[in-house]
Structure formats: structure tokens, C-alpha cells
């Protein structure tokens, strides 16, 4: 039936900050839903706390609220905006849980708001493990044997019936949070305890093991008329036991017989009917026993998910857009498939004539203490997808798109002749880790058979055969050498997905030599279109992937084109903020009449949506792949400064190959990154940097360190997200760092900087045009002291404590730097402001990045200035004056950005903040005062306000003076103080009464016992030096485990304590209302 006319306003809840298990795929689905519903004439209200999303742009919905996603705040928005319906299926687990809370607290009933897209009962039945199991039994589908436990005793009792290994899955959590696999009683007690604490309903499912079974997912869409289509069948290369978000997955499914496929198809449709999902997309996961063929249903998600984003990109069928329209009453046969230009209806099941492989990207290098074994709890931070005509081609393209330094199935570096290394290899095959695929390659190099590898890994023999064949192709080529490379052989190897770089490695030459030979032999890729119908109908949509065949379907135009290189897979330090900038560049330049070409390989993002740009190449971001596209399309300009470090690393090589890089020149980018050249510029401009030196070997480092004095910040040059950066407090620390970390630098030296203690860090984003005019986008004052990575620090716009004179000085310096570097486009600068003995502010320049930075979306939302769009137009040749963007906007309200961390996912990782970036996402809070804005941001970040009770204070000596006002404020608020001996004596001397408690090393009962007993409600704990950090580690870890609010910097504690009075108060404002104030 046609769309409903009784609904006028629809509220969409977004997914909040990016966390492990819930990344930018929900920005993609939410943005699509907003577009789809507004196209149908509905008024759309959106709430999402994450400013780095496209969906929170003011033009995406009629009212956009960047507010905390909890039922109390959403109730205020409902009261104000009076929506008729709430669509909760676009914002992942966060939105579903919030919708259930609103229903349970009677808010939906009170304001007469209807849930569309998924009914309350359907969400309940799908999410509640016990209800789901019963429902499956009623329709004759098998689930793994399991029972629900609400206490540890119940869990131990159930275990006796299901046996070890036991799988534990908490209800209503995201990405398998708190779950795991227990092989013995001790592990069971640990995992169940954690699971019960993380589950909002305090229940866990204790389930029989189906480890080693094959895992499949079906993406299903169903409408009110009971039309059902399977958009895509996805097969996990990794067997059951690895969370599907951490598995390598392949579409379409490769190893199902036709009969098995029909069985899964019928079963998944039966599941949707039983659960009652009648308008939209769901994903159903199955396990199949490789020995008996028994099929079990693992779970279903009654919403758009990570897998549906993958299925949408893999097939070209926009699941979220279709699901949004079904939610307002359309049926599938009434909707047109856009990718075929409307030639087919949406009820036409997609069929694909290529293979898609997704490989997850991990960040264990950021969390050395974490357990890198993959289990049922998701640990990856991003993913990459590749398409090819065969599984081998798409697998190898995906491997080089991961950007982990691999260029194919690279050897792991094990000595395959040694017994110890072979034993290690077998362990790696058995216990899955992030590198398992490379160990599979090594197993075949060592002469193991497919049967041997299967017995250890349970990866289906079909996949193992494919990988074995790739290894034998490698070995033959290495034996034959370059002379044997004629056109037929090279074409065969390229069809199997080998990169030029990997071929060069195998025959002992360089990538350029292989490229020259390949071009001479006329072995070039062609581009095929993704059309959702296996080329049955012509498609007008230019959504392309490369392969080595005969017919090219690219058909490039001769319009003026600009190509934007995306950021590749999400990782810590390079996330959705960079994708946001790429999307803005594409939208702005398209409006200006350019044909826009996007190159990217991340399936979760808005940039890889086929209608964000005019042409989309879904390709790895390597020099080889980019050069081939440039050659075919001949763009007027290529933008490399928007995708983070990924495209920047290619800038020099692209320029050397004659590619027109627009914006800031690769030479200026290099000048800003090269320490010695940059030092000269700073001296010439008369600016100050912290005293620094460059050391090229270990001994030199120790000598130079004495010249500067400790503490020092040490790091390798050319890194993003502060990789391998550390603060060292003495010689033994530095010696250890130089011994362990210099391996990081590729023939590049280590940088030593004097660490500025107790300085305030400031970020400034600016745009410069080709005439050298500069627009200041925003000045942000960090809340945590210098020394915490800027991506991990909270910040405030406008600054909340810096004097007007200091701010003017910062602006003056930034303008000089932009001119000195000849910046065209965006530039981000970081300063530290330190008070000298005379009480004056001294400004030190920390670093300059002549590219888009991760603060661009936040600044754009806070000031209403679309910085990435303005800068893209500057790069394409427009001036700031022509765009009417010449004056800085300083709002009279405060916006605070707060970072979100994944520490709860990684047992054993210390949650202390430092110079290495470890946050995965961000939230934003707005208020009339700094305290109010900070309180909103804390609430949005899920950081709970400590209830009255005992506050524990333990700080390093230099912080004792500064912690006094914080301690006083706590006492005035009604908290009682608890402190360790040193800090306690200091507080008592200054007239504050406090209870003294033992440090862990001083014997029991000590502070950690108090935390475990629930006696402590808030913790302020600062430390310096490695020894003190590791002594106090258990305090921070237990705080995290027992959900006690804690601060690891004095400035953070001060802001938190002063913001307590604002918690939960104040009205809600939409961005549209805030930005209107700025125009006045």
C-alpha cells in the first residue's frame, strides 16, 4: 500500500559515538533514512550525540539534536518536537535500547508516539535470549542448547548440562560485549561475572559450544504485505567462535549446496515472520555442523546492522533507504531500484557476478596488554572490503587495502625449518588471532596439506584450497624469476589478485619495474559496474571495481573532474571524522559543477555510498590502484588532504607520477612533517617550540636527552594518532624506549621534545585560499593537560579559561604559519600555553598538520561553518571572499567535545591517558556555560555522575597544590575524602579532613579492596613515571570494572566536579536554533 499520510513528524535515534561493535555503518544507515523520509515529505527530527557524523549535519533533518541518547533527554525532545512516530532501527543497539526504555517508562504512550520499523514485542523477542530460543522452538528451528542465568550459581548449574567449552552471551549488549568462551570453571566465573555486570537486564545465556562450525548470515528485507527478499547471503571464512564482526566474510556464500541455501533462505524468512519484523531489514545468523549438517539459528538483529551496511555495498541494494520507506507503509514492489535507474522494482532480489571479501582491521598495537585472541566479543575497530571476479582476487585486494603494511599473503617471518616456530605456527592456526590468514599461508609454504590445516583451523577446505593455490603460484614465480613474466602469465597472476608490489618482492625487483613491464605488455585492469542484477539490465550508476578481463564498463566522461581519496579502513587515530570531510568535499564540488570521483575501500562509510559522488571506485588506496584510475579518468585535480594519513602517504609518489595534487603542495606537507625543515621555518617566523632534538641511534638519544632535561616526549617521525609515543621521566625509561621502539621507524630517527608540565593545550583549525587569505574556523582549549593526545582530550569551543590576549597571540601565529607553509585548504595547529614564573602566558608551537584534522566536524557543528566544504572550494580555486566566508564565528554558547574509549572491551589494559591515542569516537555537549556544556558531554559519553559518598584522591607531588580546590569543592558538595598517606597528609595540613587508606603495595585492606566493596564513588588519581603508573594500575582497572567514575588528570577532575550541579538540567536546543542565533 502507498505511504501513510497520518504521520507528519518522524523521530530517528542515531547510534551515538563510535565504539567497537558500532561504527560508522550507522551514520550511513541513518543518513540514508533521513534522506529517504524527507524525500517522501515527512518532517524528520534526529537525535545523535556524535558530531562527527553526516546525519547530524543541519541540512540532513528538519531538527537535529546533538544531545545524549538516554530516555530522559529524548523525552525532552519528544515533548518539544511532538513527533508522531519513532524509527528506532537505524541507530544500532543504542537506539533499540533507548526506544525500549522510552516505551517502558511510558514516554511513548504519554506523548502518543508510535514505534515504526520494529514493534516493541519484536525487539524484545529478538534481543531477549530466552524469548528468542522459545520462539525458534515453536517454529521448529534448532538453536544451540542453552539456558538463561541471572546469577553465577545458576550459570554454574547450567554449565553441567551443556559441557565445556561453554559460550556466554549477555542480553542487550553490543558487539558481544561481556561475552566469551570458557574452557574451565575459573574462566566461566570470570566471564559470567563480567557479563552480568554489563547486561542491562543482568542476564546471560549459557550455551553449548558450536566452535568450528561454519557460520552464515542472511540479510533479509520484509514488508507489510509479507513480501520477503534475501538481499545477500554472507559466509564467514572464520568458523563459529569468532564474532562475525571480527571474521573475514565473503559474499555471496561460496560453499553452500543449492539445497542448503534454500534451507537457510526458508528458515530466515520464517524467523522474520515469527519475530514480527514486518517493515525493514534484519540479519539472521546460522551455524552449520560440517560433520552432521545440523543447522542452528545463532541470533537475529531486528534492525539495520554492520552486516546490512556490508550487504548494501556488496550488492548496490540500499537496505537502510528501503527499510525507512517500508516503515512508513510502502511495499517492496512499489519501490524502484535506483541503481538500475528504476528499471527493476525493489522486490527484485539482487544477484551478483563478482565476489566480495571483507577483512576486519584491528588495533592491538595500541593495547599491548590486551588479549589478541578472537572470541565471541568483538575487538576489531574497522574493516575493508574488496571486489573481484574470483575469491582469490577479492581476497588479495582486501589484504592490500587493510594498510597494515601487508601487500598480499606476506610470510609471517617465522623460520619454517625450526621446530619451535612450527609449534608456534600450529598454535596460531588453532587459536584465531588477527593474523591467522598469514599463518595459513605459511602453513602451505611449510608443506602442510589442506587436511592438516583444516584439522587445526576448521576453515572450510574450499577456502584453504584457494589459498594453497595462491601460495603455489607465488612459489613457482619465485623459482622462475622475472624473465618468465610474459603477458599470459602476468595476466593470470593479476587475475588472482597479486599486487605489483608483491610480484616485485617475489622476483627480487621493485614495484616500478613491474609496473613498467606490465604496461609494456599491455596488461591493464578494466572496471566493471555494481548493478545488483549481474549485468541483466544496463545501469546508469557509476559504481565500479577493477578486474583483469577484456571489456571495460567505466565509460569515463570528458567533464571537469576532481578525485577525492578516502581514508580506507577505520582505525584508532583515523576514523569517521576524515570520512566526514571527504563526503563534504564531494558534495560541495558536485554543487560547483565538477564531476566528483571517490576512491575508497571502507564499506561502513557514507563516502562509499553510490550517490555521494558522481563516480565511486571501490578500490584499495595503494599507489598502483590509484594510478590506474587516474590514468583512465584524467581528473583535473586530486585531493589527498582529507582522508587522514592514508592518501597523504601517497602524495609524493602521486606527484612524481604526474598526478595533479590540488590544495597544499606535497612539498609543504613534507615541510610540516620533516622536523629539521620545519625547525628552520619556525626560527624564521620567530616562533617558540619546546626544546627538542633528533636522535638517530640509542646512544645519541641518551646524550641529547641530558641537554634538554627530563621529562621528555619521545616519538618516531611521521605517525598518526601518536603511535609509539611516550612520556619518559628518566634515563632508564628512555633506554628501554629506544631499545623497544626504534624498530618502529623505517630508517627514520626518533624525536625528543621537552615535555611541558601543567601546560594548557590548544587546537586551532583554519582555512587558507590561493591568495593567502586565512579564515579561523575555531580555537579549542583542551581540558586535559598537554601530554594527553589531542584526540583523547576533551576540548571546549570557545576557550573557557584563556585570556583574550593569549587567544589573539594564537591567532596571529596561526596566520603566519599558514602563509609560511603556503597552505591552500585546511590546516590544524596545536599549541601549548604555559605560565612562566612572572605569571605570563608563554605560547609554544607543538605541531602543524596541513590537512583536515579530526576536529573539523566538531568545529563545523559548533560554529555552523561547513569548514570541509569551504576548504574544498578553496582547493578547487575559489577564494574565501567569493564564498562569503571571511570572518571567524565565535558562539556565545559553549560546545564541549569528549572522547570515548574502548577500555571495557580489553581486559588488562590500563585506562590512563597519555600521548598515544586510544579513543575510538567522540560526543558533543552544548550549554550556556562551560560547566553546563561539559556536563552534557559527560552525560552523552555515558560517564555517570558520582552519587554522594567517599571520593578517593591520590595525586603525584607536582599536582598536590592544584588538587586542593578540587578536594575543597568535593567536600562542599557533601562528599567525604579518602586519600593515600602522602596526599592525605597534604590535605589535612590544609584543613581538609580525610580518611587514610593503604596503597596496594602497603598491605590490606587497601584502596582496591574498598573499590571492590563498593565503598568508593569517585576517584582522582594522577601518576608519573612507569613504576608509579604500574603500581596504581589496579585502581583504575577496578574502577572501570565496577563502573566507578574516575579522572586521571587534575584538570579533568576539576571540570567534572564543577559540572556536577548542571547534570540532567537545562533545555534541549537543535543545531538549527543554535545556528540561527549566530546569524543574528
Swiss-Prot record:
Q: Where does ATP 1 bind?
A: 129, 169, 175-176, 208, 210, 215, 241-243, 285, 299
Q: Keywords in UniProt for this one?
A: Amino-acid biosynthesis, Arginine biosynthesis, ATP-binding, Ligase, Magnesium, Manganese, Metal-binding, Nucleotide-binding, Pyrimidine biosynthesis, Repeat
Q: Where is Mn(2+) 1 annotated to bind?
A: 285, 299
Q: Where is the region Carboxyphosphate synthetic domain? A: 1-403
**MGS-like domain: residues covered:** 943-1080
Task: Give GO BP annotations, semicolon-separated.
Answer: 'de novo' UMP biosynthetic process; glutamine metabolic process; L-arginine biosynthetic process
Top-level taxon of origin? Bacteria
Q: Binding of Mn(2+) 2: at which residues? A: 299, 301
Cofactor(s) this protein cannot do without:
Mg(2+); Mn(2+)
Region Allosteric domain: which residues? 943-1080
Describe the reaction catalysed, as an equation: hydrogencarbonate + L-glutamine + 2 ATP + H2O = carbamoyl phosphate + L-glutamate + 2 ADP + phosphate + 2 H(+)
Q: Name one Pfam family in it.
A: MGS
Q: Where is this region: Carbamoyl phosphate synthetic domain?
A: 555-942
Give binding positions for Mg(2+) 2.
299, 301
Q: Where does Mn(2+) 4 bind?
A: 847, 849
Which residues does Mg(2+) 3 bind? 830, 847
Tell me how this protein assembles.
Composed of two chains; the small (or glutamine) chain promotes the hydrolysis of glutamine to ammonia, which is used by the large (or ammonia) chain to synthesize carbamoyl phosphate. Tetramer of heterodimers (alpha,beta)4.
The family assignment reads: Belongs to the CarB family.
The free-text domain note is: The large subunit is composed of 2 ATP-grasp domains that are involved in binding the 2 ATP molecules needed for carbamoyl phosphate synthesis. The N-terminal ATP-grasp domain (referred to as the carboxyphosphate synthetic component) catalyzes the ATP-dependent phosphorylation of hydrogencarbonate to carboxyphosphate and the subsequent nucleophilic attack by ammonia to form a carbamate intermediate.
- Protein name (Swiss-Prot/TrEMBL): Carbamoyl phosphate synthase large chain
Species name: Xanthomonas campestris pv. campestris (strain ATCC 33913 / DSM 3586 / NCPPB 528 / LMG 568 / P 25)
Organism placement in taxonomy: Bacteria, Pseudomonadati, Pseudomonadota, Gammaproteobacteria, Lysobacterales
The gene behind this protein is carB
Amino acid at each position: 500500500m502507498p505511504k501513510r499520510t497520518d504521520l507528519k513528524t518522524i523521530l530517528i535515534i542515531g547510534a551515538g559515538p563510535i565504539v567497537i561493535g558500532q561504527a560508522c555503518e550507522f551514520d550511513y544507515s541513518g543518513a540514508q533514512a533521513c534522506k529517504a523520509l524527507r524525500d517522501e515529505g515527512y518532517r524528520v527530527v534526529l537525535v545523535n550525540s556524535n558530531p562527527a557524523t553526516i546525519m547530524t549535519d543541519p541540512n540532513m533533518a528538519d531538527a537535529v539534536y546533538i544531545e545524549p541518547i538516554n530516555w530522559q533527554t529524548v523525552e525532552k525532545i519528544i515533548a518539544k518536537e511532538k513527533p508522531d512516530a519513532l524509527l528506532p532501527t537505524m541507530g544500532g543497539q543504542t537506539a533499540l535500547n533507548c526506544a525500549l526504555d522510552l516505551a517502558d517508562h511510558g514516554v511513548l504512550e504519554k506523548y502518543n508516539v508510535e514505534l515504526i520499523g520494529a514493534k516493541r514485542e519484536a525487539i524484545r523477542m529478538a534481543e531477549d535470549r530466552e524469548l528468542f530460543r522459545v520462539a525458534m522452538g515453536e517454529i521448529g528451528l534448532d538453536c544451540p542448547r542453552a539456558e538463561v542465568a541471572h546469577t553465577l550459581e545458576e550459570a554454574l548449574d547450567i554449565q553441567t548440562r551443556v559441557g565445556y567449552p561453554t559460550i556466554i552471551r549477555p542480553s542487550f549488549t553490543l558487539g558481544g560485549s561481556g561475552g566469551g568462551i570458557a574452557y574451565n570453571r575459573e574462566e566461566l566465573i570470570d566471564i559470567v561475572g563480567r557479563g552480568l555486570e554489563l547486561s542491562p537486564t543482568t542476564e546471560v545465556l549459557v550455551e553449548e559450544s558450536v566452535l568450528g562450525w561454519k557460520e552464515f548470515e542472511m540479510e533479509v528485507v520484509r514488508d507489510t504485505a509479507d513480501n520477503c527478499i534475501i538481499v545477500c547471503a554472507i559466509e564467514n571464512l572464520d568458523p563459529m567462535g569468532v564474532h562475525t564482526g571480527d571474521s573475514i566474510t565473503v559474499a555471496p556464500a561460496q560453499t553452500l549446496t543449492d539445497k542448503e541455501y534454500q534451507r537457510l533462505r526458508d528458515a530466515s524468512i520464517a524467523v522474520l515472520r515469527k519475530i514480527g519484523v514486518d517493515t525493514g531489514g534484519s540479519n539472521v545468523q546460522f551455524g552449520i555442523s560440517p560433520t552432521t549438517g545440523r543447522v542452528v539459528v545463532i541470533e537475529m538483529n531486528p534492525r539495520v546492522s554492520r552486516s546490512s551496511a556490508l550487504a548494501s555495498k556488496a550488492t548496490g541494494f540500499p537496505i537502510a533507504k528501503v527499510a525507512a520507506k517500508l516503515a512508513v507503509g510502502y511495499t517492496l514492489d512499489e519501490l524502484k531500484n535506483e541503481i538500475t535507474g528504476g528499471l527493476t522494482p525493489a522486490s527484485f532480489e539482487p544477484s551478483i557476478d563478482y565476489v566480495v571479501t571483507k577483512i576486519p582491521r584491528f588495533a592491538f598495537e595500541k593495547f599491548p596488554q590486551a588479549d589478541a585472541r578472537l572470541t565471541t566479543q568483538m575487538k576489531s575497530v574497522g574493516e575493508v572490503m574488496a571486489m573481484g571476479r574470483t575469491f582469490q582476487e577479492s581476497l588479495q585486494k582486501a589484504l592490500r587495502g587493510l594498510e597494515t603494511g601487508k601487500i598480499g599473503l606476506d610470510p609471517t617471518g617465522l623460520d619454517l625449518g625450526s621446530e619451535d616456530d612450527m609449534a608456534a605456527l600450529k598454535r596460531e592456526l588453532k587459536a584465531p588471532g588477527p593474523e591467522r590468514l598469514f599463518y595459513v599461508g605459511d602453513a602451505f609454504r611449510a608443506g602442510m596439506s589442506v587436511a592438516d590445516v583444516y584439522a587445526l583451523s576448521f576453515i572450510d577446505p574450499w577456502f584453504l584450497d584457494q589459498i594453497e593455490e595462491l601460495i603455489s603460484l607465488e612459489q613457482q614465480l619465485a623459482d622462475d624469476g622475472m624473465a618468465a613474466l610474459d603477458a599470459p602469465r602476468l595476466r593470470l597472476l593479476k587475475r588472482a589478485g597479486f599486487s605489483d608490489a608483491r610480484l616485485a618482492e617475489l622476483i627480487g625487483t621493485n614495484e616500478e619495474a613491474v609496473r613498467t613491464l606490465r604496461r609494456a605488455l599491455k596488461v591493464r585492469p578494466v572496471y566493471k559496474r555494481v548493478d545488483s542484477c549481474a549485468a541483466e539490465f544496463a545501469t546508469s550508476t557509476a559504481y565500479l571495481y577493477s578486474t583483469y578481463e577484456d571489456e571495460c564498463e567505466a565509460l569515463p566522461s570528458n567533464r571537469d573532474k576532481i578525485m577525492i581519496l578516502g581514508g580506507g579502513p577505520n582505525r584508532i587515530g583515523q576514523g569517521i571524522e576524515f570520512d566526514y570531510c571527504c563526503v563534504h568535499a564531494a558534495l560541495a564540488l558536485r554543487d560547483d559543477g565538477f564531476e566528483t570521483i571517490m576512491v575508497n575501500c571502507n564499506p561502513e562509510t557514507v563516502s562509499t555510498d553510490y550517490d555521494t559522488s558522481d563516480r565511486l571506485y571501490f578500490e584499495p588506496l595503494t599507489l598502483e590502484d590509484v594510478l590506474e584510475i587516474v590514468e583512465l579518468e584524467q581528473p583535473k585535480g586530486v585531493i589527498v588532504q582529507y582522508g587522514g594519513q592514508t592518501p597523504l602517504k601517497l602524495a609524493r609518489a602521486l606527484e612524481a607520477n604526474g598526478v595533479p595534487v590540488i590544495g597544499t603542495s606535497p612539498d609543504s606537507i613534507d615541510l610540516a612533517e620533516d622536523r629539521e625543515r620545519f625547525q628552520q621555518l619556525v626560527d624564521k617566523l620567530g616562533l617558540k617550540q619546546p626544546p627538542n632534538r633528533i636522535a638517530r641511534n640509542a646512544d645519541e638519544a641518551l646524550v641529547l636527552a641530558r641537554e634538554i632535561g627530563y621529562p621528555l616526549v619521545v616519538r618516531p617521525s611521521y605517525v598518526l594518532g601518536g603511535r609509539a609515543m611516550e612520556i619518559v621521566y628518566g634515563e632508564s625509561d628512555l633506554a628501554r624506549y629506544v631499545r623497544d621502539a626504534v624498530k618502529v621507524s623505517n630508517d627514520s630517527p626518533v624525536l625528543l621534545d621537552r615535555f611541558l608540565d601543567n601546560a594548557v593545550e590548544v587546537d586551532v583549525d583554519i582555512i587558507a585560499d590561493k591568495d593567502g587569505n586565512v579564515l579561523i574556523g575555531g580555537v579549542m582549549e583542551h581540558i586535559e593537560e598537554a601530554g594527553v593526545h589531542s584526540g583523547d582530550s576533551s576540548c571546549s569551543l570557545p576557550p573557557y579559561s584563556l585570556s583574550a590576549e593569549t587567544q589573539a597571540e594564537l591567532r596571529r601565529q596561526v596566520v603566519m604559519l599558514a602563509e609560511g607553509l603556503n597552505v591552500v585548504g585546511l590546516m590544524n595547529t596545536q599549541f601549548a600555553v604555559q605560565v612562566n614564573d612572572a605569571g605570563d602566558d608563554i605560547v609554544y608551537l607543538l605541531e602543524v598538520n596541513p590537512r583536515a584534522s579530526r576536529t573539523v566536524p566538531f568545529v563545523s557543528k559548533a560554529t555552523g561553518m561547513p569548514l570541509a566544504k569551504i576548504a574544498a572550494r578553496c582547493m578547487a580555486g575559489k577564494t574565501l571572499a567569493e564564498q562569503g566566508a571571511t570572518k571567524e564565528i565565535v558562539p556565545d554558547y559553549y560546545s564541549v567535545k569528549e572522547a570515548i574509549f574502548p577500555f571495557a572491551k580489553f581486559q588488562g589494559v590500563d585506562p590512563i591517558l597519555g600521548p598515544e591515542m586510544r579513543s575510538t569516537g567522540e560526543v558533543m555537549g552544548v550549554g550556556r556555560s562551560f560547566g553546563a556544556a561539559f556536563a552534557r558531554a559527560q552525560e552523552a559519553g555515558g560517564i555517570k555522575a558520582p552519587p554522594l559518598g567517599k571520593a578517593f584522591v591520590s595525586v603525584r607531588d607536582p599536582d598536590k597544590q592544584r588538587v586542593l580546590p578540587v578536594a575543597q569543592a568535593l567536600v562542599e558538595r557533601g562528599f567525604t575524602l579518602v586519600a593515600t598517606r602522602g596526599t592525605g597528609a597534604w590535605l589535612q595540613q590544609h584543613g581538609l579532613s580525610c580518611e587514610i587508606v593503604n596503597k596496594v603495595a602497603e598491605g590490606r585492606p587497601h584502596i582496591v579492596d574498598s573499590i571492590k566493596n563498593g565503598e568508593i564513588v569517585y576517584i582522582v588519581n594522577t601518576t608519573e613515571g612507569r613504576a608509579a603508573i604500574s603500581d596504581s594500575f589496579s585502581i583504575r582497572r577496578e574502577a572501570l570494572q565496577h563502573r566507578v567514575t574516575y579522572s586521571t588528570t587534575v584538570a579533568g577532575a576539576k571540570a567534572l566536579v564543577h559540572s556536577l550541579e548542571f547534570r540532567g538540567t537545562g533545555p534541549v536546543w537543535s543545531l538549527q536554533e543554535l545556528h540561527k542565533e549566530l546569524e543574528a
